[in-house]
Regions:
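Short helix-loop-beta junction
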Residues: 461-486
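The substrate-binding groove and active-site-proximal loops of carbohydrate-active enzymes
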Residues: 5-12, 28-34, 169-190, 273-290, ...
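Polysaccharide-binding and catalytic clefts of secreted carbohydrate-active enzymes
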Residues: 69-327, 345, 431
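Extracellular ligand-binding/catalytic regions of CAZymes and related secreted enzymes
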Residues: 220-223, 230, 404-438, 478, ...
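Noncatalytic N-terminal accessory/assembly modules of large enzymes
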Residues: 2-58, 62-97
Length: 722
């Protein structure tokens, strides 16, 4: 077994001996610095590849302070304020950290700010309000009594939010606040290219420039107590300035409004059905950002080095699943791995030479402290991500943070050594091939490929009570035996043939969100295309409130193919008689007691006549199956990630595709164990996803079987005979 390569480790000025020891012990072939660390010159000649973290928009306060007009900006909205009798005064900075941002009253506020009557939805004419700089407040002289008002305004980011986050988490003392500057603007643009060349001249030993990241940070706001107030890992609200917005207006040919970004205070988060204006803005940003990225990567290449992009931080506009990214010149992607979905978020990116996953835990004091258990976190992270790696591998793994902290935990060092060796073996066995896929499935929502593997993700891989029952579907798919695609309603509208080759469509989420479509179902072309796909023999799985939008006598616009509807009160007058359960169904065959954990589930779902209810609780349908023409639909109220729910989804997809007969092909009877085949490479593996020993019967591709015992977390490799 190869015991060297494909691993990156962090270092620091005071960790040279530890770095040298772990280079050998973990078989690492690359070294990196991190935020808050420096690269020791003693390690230049180790033979390892050297990554240098490069901050395009910060770590140069001299420039930032000398050019305050080109500081980065964001749009922010005040809370709602209710008018009574007389004038209404709205303070702008309530609930916002003054360390983080300050009001931009330098640019024309009449053009770039907006006061909105939220009771009517109409903007207040600029003549009817004024700004008081001394109190940082907006006064509306004659508001409508008992109407609610907000102010949308531009603010300068005077402390980079990621640097603020790292400073707060690590309790850094007496650290100068790094001010982010806007590379899109003329002076800083020219300076940035010169600065990059000077950096490359003075760092000839660097092999890989690890851009962290490029130009615009995702939306991250803190309050006066330094608490996180608002976060959207996909948010574009900090990618704005009058300079950028004037360019946008010239391109699209219509006047910009702050509301295009503010979006009633929802900031166009991924649950909002995106407006035309917001999609136009994103497309504009992708083109502009990719062009500027290409300028920087061309410089890096001219010095004979590779350009790597960190998937996160200042990555807004990069959008690696969209075509503009392919023109950016990026050689490699590295990203943080929180689970299987975030692993696929990295490994599925097309057009780069290699991908790398930064595994958890990060070597920071929040985990590496007396009483901490970094081994447990490392095990959970590796075993969860391994499912996805076995479907679409990253090319490298790595860790980040303070190496000396990790070295205080010898059991952690032992475990990571085993992970590195296991990863190398895994990679050698599956590289260059596509694993066996039993079916092709497509997740259908408003975002499609742009949010591939990031559906239902508010912040990177963090749990939310309101969406874990939906995110679990994406997590299950990340390691399942399917070819997974992401399709948008716009894709279907543009070309219905996009569904050709798809076996099963999946629509997951709450009603009237971007994930289920909202008003798009009023478009007869979209509705008929999806229903026609199922009626002609396709499969459909709906989770939560699929197609949820009140229109023409239906709430669930996919009620016909799924055979269920939601009781909103409008149909209480109709009696419902279909309540018999059929728990002996193919989909439930592997479930303990033929029951399922639906997570938060859904209230008030009932079955239409002719629908087969699999599970109902107190006359609320949780799972149902339905024949629709030549096709089939499956309704599930929620499906949080678990090994048994992985199996439920697997069986549901096979049933929806009329392919129950293919169940015993590369299959384990124990749902805690999975089988992955790499036919081109003549290999297959059986993997125990749990922390306990497991016994199972394994079925191979020809339907033959054998019994197998696996130790905790164990993975066994076999050759495919014949």
């Amino acid at each position: 077994m190869n015991t060297k390569g494909r691993v990156t480790i962090p270092t620091d000025m005071d960790a040279v001996p530890e770095t040298l020891a772990l280079l050998k012990r973990w078989g690492a072939d690359a070294i990196r610095d991190c935020d808050g660390t420096e690269f020791p010159q003693e390690l230049k000649d180790t033979g390892a590849k050297i990554y240098a973290t490069y901050y395009t928009t910060r770590k140069d306060n001299a420039w930032a302070k000398a050019n305050p007009d080109e500081t980065q900006q964001c749009y922010i909205m005040t809370p709602f304020y209710t008018a009574a009798d007389g004038a209404l005064t709205i303070p702008l900075m309530t609930g916002i950290s003054r360390e983080l941002m300050k009001v931009n009253d330098h640019d024309d506020i009449a053009r770039w700010w907006e006061v909105i009557d939220r009771t009517t939805g109409e903007p207040v004419p600029t003549a009817d309000w004024h700004y008081d700089a001394a109190s940082e407040s907006v006064a509306i002289d004659a508001p409508a009594a008992y109407h609610e008002y907000t102010v949308s305004f531009l603010a300068y980011l005077i402390w980079d939010p990621v640097h603020m986050y790292n400073s707060v988490i690590n309790d850094w003392k007496d650290v100068e606040h790094q001010i982010p500057f806007d590379v899109r603007q003329p002076k800083t643009h020219a300076y940035t290219m010169r600065r990059l060349r000077e950096y490359l001249e003075s760092h000839p030993y660097v092999n890989v420039v690890r851009f962290t990241t490029f130009f615009h940070l995702f939306t991250l706001v803190f309050d006066e107590l330094r608490r996180e107030k608002y976060v959207d890992w996909y948010g574009y609200s900090a990618s704005v300035s009058p300079y950028i917005l004037e360019q946008f207006e010239k391109e699209v040919g219509y006047k910009f409004r702050p509301e295009f970004i503010i979006d009633q205070g929802y900031y166009n988060n991924q649950y909002r059905v995106p407006s035309k204006e917001y999609k136009d803005f994103q497309a504009f940003q992708r083109r502009e950002v990719a062009g500027l990225m290409k300028e920087m990567t061309d410089i890096v290449h001219a010095y004979g080095k590779e350009a790597m992009m960190f998937l996160g931080d200042h990555w807004i506009g990069c959008e690696p699943f969209m075509p503009e990214f392919q023109k950016s010149g990026v050689d490699a992607i590295v990203g943080s791995v929180g689970n299987g979905s975030t692993l696929r978020l990295i490994s599925d990116i097309p057009g780069v030479k290699y991908t790398e996953g930064r595994f958890l835990p990060y070597f920071f004091p929040d985990t590496f402290h007396e009483g901490g258990d970094p081994v447990r976190e490392a095990k959970e992270n590796w075993v969860t991500a391994r499912r996805a790696i076995l479907r679409k591998p990253i090319d490298r793994i790595g860790y980040g943070g303070y190496l000396k902290l990790a070295c205080e935990f010898p059991e952690f060092l032992d475990y990571v050594e085993s992970v590195c060796n296991e990863f190398r073996e895994l990679y050698e066995n599956i590289k260059g091939t596509t694993p066996y896929c039993v079916k092709t499935v497509a997740v259908l929502n408003s975002w499609g490929q742009q949010r591939a593997w990031g559906c239902h993700m508010v912040h990177h891989a963090l749990y939310q009570k309101q969406n874990y029952s939906y995110a679990g579907v994406i997590e299950a798919l990340s390691g399942a035996l399917f070819d997974v695609k992401f399709i948008s309603f716009d894709d279907i509208k543009a070309d219905p043939k996009v569904l050709d080759g798809i076996d099963v469509l999946i629509n997951v989420g709450d009603g009237d969100t971007a994930h289920t479509g909202g008003k798009v179902w009023e478009d007869p072309d979209v509705s008929a295309t999806v229903k026609g796909f199922v009626h002609r023999g396709g499969g459909l799985i709906g989770v939560g409130e699929p197609g949820g939008h009140q229109y023409q006598g239906r709430y669930l616009q996919l009620a016909a193919p799924l055979g269920v509807e939601k009781e909103t009160g409008f149909t209480l007058n109709y009696d419902k008689y279909n309540w018999d359960e059929h728990r002996d169904h193919f989909i439930l065959a592997d479930c303990p007691d033929h029951d399922v954990d639906f997570g938060e589930g859904k209230k008030s779902i009932f079955a239409l006549e002719g629908t087969e209810i699999l599970i109902q609780r107190d006359k609320e349908v949780q799972m149902a199956a339905h024949e629709y023409g030549q096709g089939r639909g499956v309704y599930i109220s929620g499906l949080p990630y678990s090994f048994v729910n992985n199996r439920v989804l697997y069986r549901a997809i096979l049933w929806a595709a009329h392919d129950e007969a293919d169940l015993h092909k590369w299959f384990s009877t124990n749902y805690n164990v999975e089988v992955h085949a790499y036919v081109k490479n003549g290999k297959y593996c059986v993997v125990n996803n749990t922390y306990e020993p497991q016994d199972t019967t394994v079925y191979t591709g020809d339907g033959s079987s054998f019994d197998l015992h696996l130790d905790a977390n164990e993975i066994k490799w076999y050759s495919i005979e014949g």
